[in-house]
A protein has these predicted regions:
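Residues on the lipid-exposed face of transmembrane beta-strands in outer-membrane beta-barrel proteins
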Residues: 82-88, 135, 163-169, 228-234, ...
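Short loop/turn motifs that connect adjacent beta-strands in outer-membrane beta-barrel proteins
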Residues: 41-59, 90-129, 171-183, 236-250, ...
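Long, hydrophobic/aromatic-enriched structural stretches that serve as scaffold segments
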Residues: 106-200
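Residues that define the transmembrane beta-barrel architecture of outer-membrane proteins
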Residues: 76-82, 157-161, 182, 222-228, ...
């Protein structure tokens, strides 16, 4: 890698108290090197080569997702999550960062530097890529809502406000009967009072006439939140926007997440059965990589050639998702990473199951999708009283 040996040599003897400066130097070297992350020279002029519309960022649709344990008759643990997601259209041909808004182009270069194989063959006919931007909030509370002191044997009050940026690559290996979706998502945000979790919960509880939680003064303290998620999913290769008629399929996957939001490795499988199952990579609760809305070269056929056998069609299916993960860090259980705080004895192994139904249809020439699921999660810490359950609703619209 160009220049990295020199950077590492220059960091010899750097004090331990300066890790952020060291990381900044390395990232800057990756982002601003005259050799880009894709192995070719980058134009640094004010007038980059002409960019076609297919190589520029255009928005394809969005998703609003709400998760809450009130759907399952409880009010504790992971108690609420909301996320608003925007998804781009497919970027055709080889990826050109200079054709993208600067922050997104820089992130594409950073991924190519940190994971050189991710953009390999990005211009091949058997691969495509798109971008997902997500803004969301999550909140966690103990079981006892009336106590105003720290509850040592229950999870801390915690909130997270975040912005996520994900690149998705859909790949069909040559002559293979399967296809893959690779995801690289960077999440940045804030933990603590600045997440506005207390205010959000109080607003909802007042509107519904529910007693408010009294212990938010003991929530985790403010600190920056970050996480890098790397995920791969795979399923049988299918042409078109749906699998026509009645059918079923299986989606497998594995992921690694690193950061002070969560550090964990997971693997899972999803089973789907129904009518006109969409040619995507499944339905999941809120987490990095979940709102993948993968690239789909046939999306435009909805309006240009609606009678094509490849075009999107109404349909519905049921799904069952099973996932297991090994957890090394979870801010909602381990507390603040950069200062002492309330925490509990986290379990290193967690399993999760989700059962739901998803339907898609065409309204006024626009694609609409609604997915509803119930999620069960095993105990996450020693003192937890049994498993936890919550409901999830997601409404998606294609522009």
């Amino acid at each position: 890698m160009i220049g990295i040996d020199g950077y590492l040599w220059s960091l010899r003897g750097t004090k331990v108290q300066q890790p952020m400066q060291c990381a900044a130097l390395l990232i800057a070297g990756a982002l601003f090197s005259p050799i880009d992350a894709f192995g070719s020279e980058v134009s640094l002029s004010a007038n980059p080569p002409s960019c076609s519309p297919e190589q520029s960022l255009r928005w394809r649709g969005g998703t609003l997702r709400l998760e809450n344990d009130l759907f399952t008759g409880s009010d504790r643990n992971y108690t609420n999550g909301v996320a608003l997601t925007a998804v781009s259209r497919d970027l055709q041909g080889g990826l050109r960062p200079e054709c993208l808004p600067q922050p997104i182009g820089l992130y594409a270069r950073f991924i190519g530097w940190a994971d050189p194989g991710f953009w390999r063959d990005s211009g091949a006919q058997t691969s495509s890529q798109n971008l997902v931007v997500r803004f969301g909030q999550s909140m966690y509370t103990p079981e006892n809502k009336t106590r105003t002191d720290v509850i040592p044997d229950d999870r801390p009050y915690a909130g997270l406000l975040y912005l996520g940026l994900a690149w998705n690559r859909r790949i069909h290996p040559q002559a293979a009967s399967y296809e893959m979706l690779d995801v690289r998502e960077l999440t940045l945000g804030v933990i603590g009072p600045w997440s506005l979790a207390e205010q959000s919960q109080d607003l909802v509880h007042r509107a519904r006439g529910i007693e408010r939680f009294r212990g938010w003064d003991n929530q985790l303290r403010n600190e920056p939140a970050f996480q890098m998620a790397m995920e791969r999913k795979f399923k049988a290769y299918t042409e078109g926007a749906v699998r026509p008629g009645w059918g079923s399929d299986v989606i497998g996957g594995y992921a690694l997440r690193v950061g002070n939001i969560e550090t964990a490795a997971s693997t899972g499988v999803e089973f789907r059965a129904g009518w006109n199952i969409p040619n995507d990579f499944g339905s999941y609760p809120i987490r990095p990589g979940a709102e993948n809305r993968p690239p789909s070269g046939v999306a435009d056929l909805r309006t240009t050639t609606p009678q094509s056998v490849l075009a999107p069609k109404p349909g519905a299916h049921v799904f069952l998702n099973l996932e297991g993960k090994a957890v090394a860090w979870d801010f909602s259980l381990d507390g603040n990473m950069f200062r002492h705080s309330h925490h509990v004895s986290r379990w290193p192994w967690v399993a999760q199951a989700a059962l739901g139904i998803s339907s898609q249809w065409i309204v006024a020439g626009r694609g609409v999708r609604l997915a509803v699921m119930r999620v069960w999660r095993t105990r996450e810490f020693d003192q937890q009283a049994g498993h936890h359950a919550f409901g999830s609703i997601a409404l998606s619209l294609e522009f």
